[in-house]
Amino acid sequence: MARKDKKTLPASGAGIVRYFNDDTAGVKLSPKQVVIGTIIVALICIALRFTTSVGY
């Protein structure tokens, strides 16, 4: 019988993406900081909306 040498690929070859924990330069924000920042920006936008009377 003929011997079949099957080559198997790693899991990433099957469409699964592997992410590595490489430290990169830049700002590191926690999810809590992102939520608080979003709320602050929203409040500033709402305050500007009610304090300006240009075309409204």
From Swiss-Prot:
Describe its membrane topology: Single-pass membrane protein
What main location does UniProt list?
Answer: membrane
Extracellular domain ranges by topology: 53-56
Compartment(s): Cell membrane
Listed under GO cellular component are: plasma membrane
Q: What is any one GO biological process for this UniProt entry?
A: protein transport
Domain of life, source organism: Archaea
Q: Which residues lie on this side of the membrane: Cytoplasmic?
A: 1-30
List membrane-spanning regions. Answer: 31-52
Keyword annotations for this protein, in alphabetical order, are: Cell membrane, Membrane, Protein transport, Translocation, Transmembrane, Transmembrane helix, Transport
Q: What does this protein do?
A: Involved in protein export. The function of the beta subunit is unknown, but it may be involved in stabilization of the trimeric complex.
**Family to which this protein belongs:** Belongs to the SEC61-beta family.
Self-association state and partner proteins as the record states: Component of the protein translocase complex. Heterotrimer consisting of alpha (SecY), beta (SecG) and gamma (SecE) subunits. Can form oligomers of the heterotrimer.
- Protein's name in the database: Preprotein translocase subunit SecG
| Biological source species | Methanosphaera stadtmanae (strain ATCC 43021 / DSM 3091 / JCM 11832 / MCB-3)
